[in-house]
Amino acid sequence: MDSSHQSNYKLSKTEKKFLRKQIKARHTLLRHEGIETVSYATQSLVVANGGLGNGVSRNQLLPVLEKCGLVDALLMPPNKPYSFARYKTTEESKRAYVTLNGKEVVDDLGQKIILYLNFVEKAQWKELRPQALPPGLMVVEEIISSEEEKMLLESVDWTEDTDNQNSQKSLKHRRVKHFGYEFHYENNNVDKDKPLPGGLPDICDSFLEKWLREGYIKHKPDQMTINQYEPGQGIPAHIDTHSAFEDEIVSLSLGSEIVMDFKHPDGTAVPVMLPRRSLLVMTGESRYLWTHGITCRKFDTVQASENHKSGIITSDVGDLTLSKRGLRTSFTFRKVRQTPCNCSYPLVCDSQRKETPPSFPESDEEASRLEQEYVHQVYEEIAGHFSSTRHTPWPHIVEFLKALPSGSIVADIGCGNGKYLGVNKELYMVGCDRSQNLVDICRERQFQAFVCDALAVPVRSGSCDACISIAVIHHFATAERRVAALQEIVRLLRPGGKALIYVWAMEQEYNKQKSKYLKGNRNSQGKKEEMNSDTSVQRSLVEQMPDMGSRDSASSVPRINDSQEGGCNSRQVSNSKLPIHVNRTSFYSQDMLVPWHLKGNPDKGKPVEPFGPIGSQDPSPVFHRYYHVFREGELEALCRTVSDVRILQSYYDQGNWCVILQKA
């Protein structure tokens, strides 16, 4: 029903419900995606809930739309819960608006979805993707015949005795078998002193000899891993350890096609189609610098045209659809390296780092030790330099503090150099920080501050009218400790008290806008480098989040454990090493170490540059701070686990996710 006609007669209960849903879809599209709808009829429509991100394929949606007229174009952006349709005439689009609004369709998983249509001025979408494969990457189609594929698949006995854990394992994400050497997923490496008996299967010899002759590989592999993936399974993004294997790594895809995601440290992402019976060859930059992984999902976004079988999935949204995954088996071949790696990518090379980064924490005790070394000690060392970069308060934080009633008692948990303690002279503000040196700077500025841990603040329960926690919670190394930090903040609040929380966002490009962190001067530094600009742009999110149990919304916000559904965990393989982030680039891991180049002559000793590349000409000591960057919706999901609190508002502010909470 057209909302412009609602005043002509009294709406029924069903019509009112539909109208609310349609308006909600319209507002969500505007807030989340910047898509503005219009109240008058045009040739173009945006179809909320009719997108590849909802599990609706081109083959499903197009026939539904064509019942109302000739569809000139159907644009389906990847991973989005909506699409754009342009009809030949405005009359046809009006017919679709009236006929299809509120229509129920069934997605590829058999779930019911309700479509909501709104007019837009133009059906358009621009998304630039690289038109070339990562350097050193090659996909060779039909490298083997269907008969050879059948022979290889039948040679794998998944029912054999699994007591020998050196050769076969059933992982959470997939089934694996190892030959030559066991591949250890906790460190993406092999034990070179413990080869497996039997070597590689004889059936592989003829294929390997052929690939050697044809130049696809330079070394005959002596290690092979067979992975079997059910639909919906995958493998986290990773780089095979440099020191473990020689340059080329090749993978043969059997049984089903798959889309593998490659990502450069600068954020460039390239989805690559690996057809059935194709050989993926990774050498050079694609092997050493780019991460590769398979996203856990049952459908891949692929080209709809028949002539596109392998290579990059382009950004032509007029030629994208969904492809249902099948049972895929991969044979991955590697040559074990016997000497240190001397590649051209020392920042990500384990052979060329002076020290080894720490592993992901597996317990609260390990997390505490990690925070002590890579958060607390670092800020003690860099406090002076850090404070010199912290001067201008952020506008939306100032707005929150100035809106509080005069005389309010406010605690700044993790106050740093006290940048916010003097913003509103009408408040009684007190700060606390884990760093003694930063607290001393606060006191030099005549602010009230003391040293404590954010998990145990020595302040009476219910004594604060408000709290702020700016760029602190992302330094806690486990979800449980992050929740505990939130609970401690809520404990301090009186009933009705409010808290403002900022954390660093995984999405440093949002609504097609890069954050100041990505655009900023690469030579500048800051404690929370995500918070180093004098201006900010706030992007409000939906304050009343849609019901996650319903597919009847234009978009949704993930719950805290969404990323773990289907056997995939957002964190990388347990015990794997924390990656070191390249400053001023997009994130490819949620948990990482972020470098800080200490400028000037530090008073305290001469700290050694940890994990720095051999031959580095930078005389500045480099420290590394632990961060967990938050995905969209993760902070809200974390807050929902805390009792006696509700979310008043959530928004995006220059590379940070932010919430305002109120205690019940």
UniProtKB/Swiss-Prot annotation:
Residues 552-575 have a biased composition (Polar residues). Keywords: Cytoplasm, Iron, Metal-binding, Methyltransferase, Multifunctional enzyme, Nucleus, RNA-binding, S-adenosyl-L-methionine, Transferase, Zinc. Residues 43-120 form the RRM domain. Residues 220-337 form the Fe2OG dioxygenase domain. One of its GO terms (cellular component) is nucleus. Fe cation binds at residues 238, 240, 292. CDD domains: AdoMet_MTases, RRM_ALKBH8. Its cofactor is Fe(2+). It comes from the Eukaryota. Belongs to the alkB family. This is tRNA (carboxymethyluridine(34)-5-O)-methyltransferase ALKBH8.
